[in-house]
Every structure is written in structure tokens, then in C-alpha cells.
A protein has these predicted regions:
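Bacterial N-terminal signal peptides
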Residues: 3-18
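Primarily EF-hand calcium-binding motifs
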Residues: 90-107, 116-129, 152-164, 170, ...
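N-proximal helix/coil linker or "cap" segments that precede and/or mark the start of modular domains
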Residues: 195-243
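Thiol-/selenol-based redox modules, centered on thioredoxin-like
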Residues: 213-217, 350-408
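Structural micro-motif
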Residues: 237-239, 260-261, 341-345, 360-367
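A short beta-strand-turn-helix
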Residues: 241-261
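Aromatic-flanked redox-active Cys/Sec active sites in thiol-based oxidoreductases
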Residues: 265-271
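Structural microenvironment flanking redox-active thiols in thiol-disulfide oxidoreductases
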Residues: 273-340
């Protein structure tokens, strides 16, 4: 059991602390070449030497932390396709679902009415709405056409959501149209392309792209992602005890787990994609609040002002340094709660990140834990693996698993 608590009283103040430089001798950091200096890794020759050393040192299957380190040094794109982040893991798949419905999986489809008495549950599995569930409906891989469209729309949504609270308002849409039209009565497709597609290198907006040294430092401080890989499918969920953000309630995970499955969410204020997608998680909670428990653990900042800072955060009014005390983290969490208005309990991780590390929860991740306390679903690491629709389907199948089978 991981035990820690948040002070009952706290005050939200501006943060003036300075983030510490990463400790390159920490046992959590992969073994590094002698004399390794992140600042020198912006030189291709130095980075190539480090890659050569690491690939000799780590043969065979490599940990996620080593894969991420190699990806950075090789100059791979910061996205979900170039070995940055592993895919989600789930106990359920189409074969399991077909067996549950009494259908031969080789047929390639399951009539929706064979799945459950609840129409709502079946609808969430039938992603394309054609009345049956196919392997494509459950496919959340990067190459799936639906997933690619979701990613594109999510990026556009974030650029339209000016205050970055995950809620697009009429005022924001009106402002967007004015900016695109530039005084005209209308906006053309080209006007929107110029406005919405960043005029910068790569997939990052202006002022958001990191240098190689910054990526390395963010990895070593676990702002880019926790170095531990977290529990696997079928593992018992690591227990913990935390107070809610306002200090009024203490919650222990093992006492929440029981007849209902539990959705565990880990995230932070300075991760723009997490802010954009958080309301989707709250919407899932609203749909299943009588059938499942929902908890959020607030973890280490992904893009603090004294780390890999992003100009897009500053433009949205999100500018905080990395907290170095628990009180400061509670204060930043309070800013998150004021902006996002979460409807589920929000717990604050201890400043040395025991829960974030135990669940590999930085910068964000989703889990579904079944009624026996076992991991049924583990999302890919955020932001690219943070797929709320995928989590919801896993939750639906967890509910189906625990319910009486329908007579066929």
C-alpha cells in the first residue's frame, strides 16, 4: 500500500520554485554512455555515438524507457508511430466478444442484439453504427482510418478551443470565423487551412517544439513520461491511499474496488491534449456513473514553465512551474479543477510521484480495473495513447464480462 496525504488546508499561489536538473545517476534512468551530456545530443554525431553505445548495451527486447531514449536520440517524430509510446493493452478482443455472444468469430461480425440487453452498451461497441460489431469497430491502432480522423479532429479542436478548457463555445467559434475571414463576410477552405495548420516545423505549433536536449531532460525528470512501465493486464492494481484535492476525503483504491469496475485516470494541468480530452472522460462517467467508479490522480506536470514549456499553454493562460512541494502541487491541481470543473474525485499524488510511477501515469493514462482488482485495460501513454473511446469500449466489455450471459 502506498500511503500519503494532501494537507487539509491549502492556498492557490503563483509558483516561484525552480525545477531541479535531472539526476542522471538515478536507478530509474536507463544506463547511459560514459560522460553522457544531454546538451551535446543536439549534435548528430554525438547522438549517433550514444545510440551505438546504447544498442550494444541493451540487446534483445528493450524497456519502454530505453526505446523512448533511442527514439529521441535518433530524431524520430514525437508522435504515436515512431516508437515513442507503446499501444494500449486490453484483456478483451473481438474473439472474446464473439465467444461471449455465441457467434463464430470467423464470421467477422456480431449482430448487436446478441451482445447485451442494454442497447447503450452494444451501441458503444458498434462504432460505425451499422448494427453489428466487427473487428474494425474495436481497432484503435494508429493506422485505422477512424482513429486517424479522430486524431486530426482532436488537433483541430485544440486549436479552436482558445481558452483550452476542453469546451468549444459559440464565442470561440465566432472569433475563429473572424480570424479566418479577415474582414470578409465569409471564410474559404484556404482561409481555414492557413489559420489551422501551424506554420512551423513538424506537428507542433509555433513555440511548442522541443530541442533534443529538452526532450532528454523531460524524459529523465519523467515529465515526458514515467520511466516505469506500470502494471500489466491481469495484474492486481497497485493499491494507494490519497486525499481528495480539497482535503475533505481520504480514498483508498482497494476499498473502492468491488462490485463495480473502476476507471482510473492520471493526468496534469499543463498537458494540452489532456485538458482537451478530459471532458470526454467526464462524459463517459456521466453515462456509467451507476455502473462504474471513476477516480483521477493528479500527477507531475508535463510542460511546466521551467521545463518543456509550450507557448500554446501561455496563450491559454496555463503557465506554472514544476511544483517541488506537495502544497504547490495541490495549488496547481486547484487551477486545473477551476478550469476543467471535474465531476469525479480528484486525488493529488505525492511530490515524489509514487502513484504516477506505479501506474506509469505521466503525462497521462487511463486504466480500467475490474471488480476483482485486476487490470482489464491499460491505455497507451498520453498524449497519443489517450483514447477515451477505446477506454469506454474496454469498460463496456468489462461490464459485459461481469453480467449474466444473454440467452441466444
Amino acid at each position: 500500500l502506498i500511503r500519503f496525504a494532501v494537507p487539509i488546508a491549502f492556498v492557490c499561489t503563483s509558483l516561484t520554485v525552480r525545477s531541479a536538473e535531472p539526476n542522471l545517476t538515478s536507478p530509474q534512468i536507463p544506463k547511459l554512455p560514459p560522460g553522457f551530456d544531454p546538451d551535446k545530443m543536439s549534435e548528430p554525431k554525438e547522438a549517433a555515438k550514444a545510440v551505438e553505445w546504447l544498442e550494444k548495451e541493451y540487446t534483445g527486447k528493450k524497456s519502454e524507457a530505453v526505446r523512448m531514449l533511442l527514439a529521441i536520440l535518433k530524431g524520430m517524430r514525437a508522435d504515436g508511430k515512431d516508437a515513442w509510446f507503446g499501444p494500449a493493452e486490453c484483456r478483451f478482443d473481438f474473439t472474446w466478444l464473439a465467444g461471449r455472444a455465441g457467434v463464430d468469430p470467423k464470421k467477422g461480425s456480431i449482430p448487436r442484439d446478441r451482445l447485451a440487453a442494454s442497447v447503450t452498451l452494444a451501441e458503444r461497441l458498434d462504432r460505425d453504427g451499422d448494427g453489428k460489431v466487427t473487428p474494425s469497430d474495436l481497432d484503435w491502432s494508429d493506422q485505422n482510418p477512424y482513429v486517424m480522423q479522430v486524431g486530426f479532429v482532436n488537433r483541430l479542436f485544440r486549436r479552436m478551443d482558445k481558452d483550452s478548457d476542453g469546451r468549444l463555445t459559440r464565442e470561440e467559434l465566432d472569433e475563429l470565423l473572424k480570424r479566418a475571414a479577415k474582414g470578409k463576410e465569409f471564410a474559404t477552405a484556404e482561409d481555414f487551412r492557413v489559420l489551422m495548420i501551424p506554420r512551423s516545423a513538424g506537428s507542433f505549433g509555433p513555440g511548442d517544439g522541443p530541442s533534443v536536449p529538452m526532450l532528454l531532460r523531460s524524459l529523465f525528470t519523467q515529465e515526458l513520461g514515467a520511466l516505469a512501465e506500470g502494471p500489466k493486464i491481469g495484474d492486481t492494481a497497485p493499491d494507494f491511499m490519497l486525499k481528495t484535492r480539497n482535503g475533505k476525503e481520504t480514498i483508498q483504491l482497494s476499498k473502492v474496488i468491488g462490485a463495480k469496475p473502476t476507471v482510473l485516470l492520471l493526468g496534469n494541468f499543463t498537458c494540452g491534449p489532456f485538458r482537451a480530452m478530459y471532458p470526454d472522460v467526464d462524459a463517459v462517467r456521466e453515462r456509467y456513473k451507476d455502473q462504474a467508479n471513476f477516480l483521477m490522480v493528479y500527477v507531475r506536470e508535463a510542460h511546466p514553465a521551467d521545463g518543456w514549456k509550450m507557448d500554446s499553454n501561455k496563450r491559454s493562460g496555463v503557465e506554472v512551474k514544476q511544483p517541488t512541494t506537495l502544497d504547490e502541487r495541490v495549488g496547481v491541481c486547484s487551477q486545473f479543477c477551476a478550469k476543467l470543473r471535474p465531476n469525479m474525485p480528484v486525488l493529488v499524488d505525492e511530490i515524489d510521484d509514487p502513484v504516477g510511477r506505479a501506474y506509469s501515469g505521466m503525462p497521462g493514462r487511463l486504466y480500467v480495473i475490474d471488480g476483482r482488482g485486476k487490470i482489464a485495460y491499460k491505455a497507451g501513454r498520453g498524449p497519443f495513447g489517450f483514447r477515451v473511446g477505446e477506454m469506454e469500449q474496454a469498460l463496456v466489455m468489462t461490464l459485459l464480462e461481469a453480467s449474466p450471459k444473454k440467452d441466444h
